[in-house]
C-alpha cells in the first residue's frame, strides 16, 4: 500500500470475529487482529475507513431470531457498533454502518443468491427453502435503517466530542437509461431510481420511503413511527457510493396485476444488464453513469459528502498482468469524477476496487478486480503488481498518467490527483 501511494484503505470488521455470538464478550484475538491492522495503517500514514457490516452477521443471531428480519437486531447491532467505536474510535474517523443494504436485501431476502439466502418460490434463483420474498427485503432494509440511525445517534452522543469522527452508510448504484424514448420507459427509469437509491436515501433525507414504493408495495412496506422518522432523517454524515456499470430500463407495469409480488414486480420495470453479473466479462468504459449518479445525489439529496467506496474493472482471474482494460476503466471513471466535482458534487474521496484480487461475492475466484495479482498456489500468497497498479500509483502521486507502457490515453489523469482535489 505504501509503495502504491495509498493514503486511505477501506476494510470491514467481521461482527462474528469480534463478538462470536453476536452479543456478549469480545474475542480478544479478534480485537488484537483489528488493533494490529489499524495501527499498521496509521503508522504508515494510511487512514482507515471501516465498514461494520458487509454481508456478515453472526450465525447465532440468525439462528435465534432471523437476523435482519427481526427488530431485535437493532439493539444488538448498536451494541456491536458501540464496542467498535470504543475500541477503535481513537484511530478510526470514518465509519460505514452497513455496506450496500439495497442489494444486500435483494440478494439475501428476495432472490436467495447471497447470504443469508432467504427467498420464497417463485422468486428464488437458488433452491430457497425459507423466507418470504414478498416482504422480507423491505423488512430487512427497514431494520438496517433503524440500526444505522441508532448507531449514528450513539456515536454523536457518546463519542463524537472526543473522537471527531463520522458515520455514514453506503449505497449500490448504477447508471440508467430508458430502453426507448417512450413515456412509459422514462417513468420506469425514474421508478427504478426510487426503488434502488430512493429506498435508502429518501428516509435518510426526508424521513420516509418514496411514494412509488409505498404505493406499489402497499401494506407490505414497513412504516416509520414519528420518532423513528426523526431518528433516521439526517442520520448520515456521508454516503458511500458503490458503482461499476450501467443498465437500460424498460417498463413492466403488467407485473402489478399479479396477486403475488416481490420487489421486482413492485418496481414494475425490467432492468437490462449489459453484462452477466455472474461472469468474468469486462465492463464497458462508460463513466457517464457514475457522473450522473453523483449529480443526482447533489440535486435530490442535499449534496452530501460522498466517498466512492467501490469502482473497478472486472477481468478473468487468469488474465494478463498487462490489464489494459482496467487502466482505461480507472482513467475514464476518475475523469467522470472530475467532471462531477466541476459540477459541484461533494465527492471527498475515491477508492478503486480492489487493491488485491480477492474472493468475490458473486463469482468467487473466477473473476478479479485487483490492482495486484495474488498467486493462490504460492504458500506465501505472493503479490504481483499489474499494469493498473503502476498507473494508479502514478495517479496518486500526481505524476503524468497519459502514457503507461504502450497505452496512450486521451487526458492526463494526474490533473485529478487526490492531493489536489480530495481534501
Residue map of PLM features:
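N-terminal carbohydrate-binding accessory modules
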Residues: 2-6
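Active-site region of glycoside hydrolase catalytic domains
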Residues: 21-23, 31-423
Amino acid at each position: 500500500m505504501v509503495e502504491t501511494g495509498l493514503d486511505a484503505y477501506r476494510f470491514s470488521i467481521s461482527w462474528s470475529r469480534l463478538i462470536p455470538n453476536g452479543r456478549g464478550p469480545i474475542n480478544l484475538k479478534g480485537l488484537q487482529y483489528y488493533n494490529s491492522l489499524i495501527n499498521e495503517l496509521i503508522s504508515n500514514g494510511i487512514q482507515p475507513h471501516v465498514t461494520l457490516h458487509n454481508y456478515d452477521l453472526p450465525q447465532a443471531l440468525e439462528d435465534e431470531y432471523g437476523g435482519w428480519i427481526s427488530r431485535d437486531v437493532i439493539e444488538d447491532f448498536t451494541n456491536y457498533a458501540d464496542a467498535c467505536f470504543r475500541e477503535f474510535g481513537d484511530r478510526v474517523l470514518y465509519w460505514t454502518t452497513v455496506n450496500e443494504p439495497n442489494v444486500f436485501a435483494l440478494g439475501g431476502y428476495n432472490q436467495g443468491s447471497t447470504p443469508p439466502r432467504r427467498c420464497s418460490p417463485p422468486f428464488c434463483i437458488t433452491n430457497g427453502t425459507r423466507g418470504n420474498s414478498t416482504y422480507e427485503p423491505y423488512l430487512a432494509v427497514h431494520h438496517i435503517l433503524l440500526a444505522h440511525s441508532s448507531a449514528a445517534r450513539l456515536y454523536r452522543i457518546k463519542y463524537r466530542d472526543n473522537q471527531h469522527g463520522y458515520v455514514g452508510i453506503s449505497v449500490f448504484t448504477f447508471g440508467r437509461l430508458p430502453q426507448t424514448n417512450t413515456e412509459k420507459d422514462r417513468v420506469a427509469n425514474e421508478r427504478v431510481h426510487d426503488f434502488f437509491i430512493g429506498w435508502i436515501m429518501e428516509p435518510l433525507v426526508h424521513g420516509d420511503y418514496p411514494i412509488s414504493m409505498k404505493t406499489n408495495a402497499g401494506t407490505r412496506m414497513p412504516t416509520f413511527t414519528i420518532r423513528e422518522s426523526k431518528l433516521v432523517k439526517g442520520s448520515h454524515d456521508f454516503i458511500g457510493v458503490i458503482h461499476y456499470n450501467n443498465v437500460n430500463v424498460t417498463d413492466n407495469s403488467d407485473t402489478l396485476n399479479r396477486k403475488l409480488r416481490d420487489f421486482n414486480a413492485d418496481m414494475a420495470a425490467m432492468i437490462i444488464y449489459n453484462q452477466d453479473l455472474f461472469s468474468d466479462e469486462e465492463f464497458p468504459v462508460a463513466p457517464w453513469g457514475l457522473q450522473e449518479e453523483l449529480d443526482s445525489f447533489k440535486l435530490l439529496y442535499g449534496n452530501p459528502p460522498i466517498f466512492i467506496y467501490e469502482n473497478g474493472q472486472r477481468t478473468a482471474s487468469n488474465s494478463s498482468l498487462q490489464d489494459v482494460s482496467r487502466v482505461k476503466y480507472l482513467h475514464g471513471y476518475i475523469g467522470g469524477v472530475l467532471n462531477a466535482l466541476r459540477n459541484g458534487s461533494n465527492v471527498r474521496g475515491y477508492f478503486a476496487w480492489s487493491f488485491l484480487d480477492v474472493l468475490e461475492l458473486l463469482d468467487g475466484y473466477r473473476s478479479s478486480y485487483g490492482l495486484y495479482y495474488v498467486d493462490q498456489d504460492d504458500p506465501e500468497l505472493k503479490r504481483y503488481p499489474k499494469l493498473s497498479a503502476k498507473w494508479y500509483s502514478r495517479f496518486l502521486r500526481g505524476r503524468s498518467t497519459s502514457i503507461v507502457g504502450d497505452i496512450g490515453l486521451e487526458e492526463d489523469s494526474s490533473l485529478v490527483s487526490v492531493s489536489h482535489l480530495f481534501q
